Structure formats: structure tokens, C-alpha cells
Amino acid sequence: QSLIFISNEGNFGSSNGSISVFQGKSKIQEIKNVGDVVQSILVHDEKLIAIVNNSHLIKIYQITKQGLRLPGIKVSTQNSSPREMVVQDNKLYFTNHNTQDIKILNLTTYFIEDAIKVDGLPESIVSDGKNLWVAINMNEDWSSATSVQKINIASKTIIKTFEVGKGPQQLLVDEDFLWVSRTYYNDNFTKTFFGTSQINMITGEVKILEYGKGSVCGGDLFKTDGLVYRTYNGGVAPLNAELMIEPLGKIGSYNSNNLYSANGTEEKIFLGITSDYQEPDTVFVHNNFGELEHEYIVGASPGDYAVWTIN
């Protein structure tokens, strides 16, 4: 058995971001007013960690079989605009737009003990155990950036910068490969373009693919049942070794304008839908054959997902 956590961003400038907790098909807890834009969540040991972007907070909750123990612990990030995170060796590394860095939170003391400066606005962050890999999504002037930076954890320094094409967004470690979803815009933001890149983390070789006009992708990238999926045309579709989207394997067919987020575990795929950015919204849960299993009713703009296995 497991608990499923879904973070709902809420509306920018208000504090109605929330976290919904489900066991099986049932909602067992809804934590309202977590803050202003609940950006990302992750499970580490018996804790759920949430980044609240526009409240500039990290919230840490103890997980029990009954859900999250309240009120949890709050850590201020000092107006940094925190975004995404990864845990390595009991330290939380999280990206920040305003301060253009990766801050390091000690998960024993809850003290932010250091920061690693990067060049641009960092978004997704993953770890291979020895190095952090960080997607630089935008330059300081909000134009599309083009790099992924490899940072040695021990020395806290950038050891290599990989050019991967415009708008790197989400990262996914898949054995020796790092997948990069990309989204970028023309100069006046009237057109959106999509691509996928892949870094061979052993050889350093980079593959880059741009998708043609008319493909509607999102940035979400995850692995389920041995395949890497990306949001595509109102659902999710697998990517092949040449980085092409395989439309025949698509799961879900929702209005592509309303598909807000997607994620997956080994057996389940979550598709978060909003039509008006107001609560209630819906997460559709599919199995990896593509069949719809059930629907979760959640708060405004479901954005991220995490699972805790009940021991």
C-alpha cells in the first residue's frame, strides 16, 4: 500500500496552494493554504518536502499512515524564488530563480548551509550520486537559455556545461543517460516550440531533436514500465532512442490546453487537468496499459506528485 501526494499550485499572489493525500481511490487528507504556489514536492525517508515558490518557503512534514502530521516545519529561503529539488546524502539541493543558485539545506539541522552560484535561472535538478545536473531554463533577462550544468557535489563547483538547445526544462536520469525536455518561445512569446535532448553521462555526447510545428508537448518527463514518457497532445507518449515521440503509445486524450502536469510510477500514470486554474481540479489516474482507473479531485492546478510506500 502507498500514499499518493499531489501538490496543487493554487493561484499566484494568493496563499491557496494545497496538498492532497490519497490512499487507493480515497482522499484521506487535504492540506489547504500551504502557501503561494506549491511548486514541487518529494518524499525522502518518512518526510514530505514541499517548495512554496512565491512564499519563498520550504515546508517539511512527517509522513504517517494517516497522512501528514501538521503543522510541519517551515524554512525561509529569503526571497529566493525556489523551484525544484533533489536529495543527496541527507542534504536538499534546490534551485532558485531570484538568487540564481542552488541552495543546500541540511535535513538534520534544517539550516541552509551553502549555495552554489549558476549562470542563469535554474529549473530542474537531478543527481547521479556524485554530481548534480541542473537545467538552466532562462537567462537573467528571461530569454531562453540553452545549457545543462554538471556540478560536483563534493567540491560544489560547476565542472562542465553542456549545450542542449533552447529552453531546457525537466531532467530525468535513465541509467547512463540524462533526458532533457525543452520548451521555448519566439521573441514576442506568440509561438511555442518543443524539443528533447539527451546527454550520455559517460561519454558526454549530446543528442538534440527539435519537434516540428503543430506538436503540442508539455515539459513533463518521467519513466514508467521501462519507458520514458513526455507530455504530448493532451496525454503522454513514449520517446524512442532517437528522441522521437511515439504517438501510437500515447496514454490519455484530454484537451491539450487543459493538461497541466503528468507523472508516473512503475504502475500508474497521473494526468493533472485544469480548465480555469481554479479549484476543484482533477487528476486522472491511468494504468500503464493506458486504461483510466480512477479520478482524484484536487485543488487548483495540480503540478507535482510523490509516493510514499507504507512499510
Give names to the regions the model predicted.
Residues Q1-N311:
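Predominantly soluble domains enriched in secretory-pathway, periplasmic, or organellar proteins
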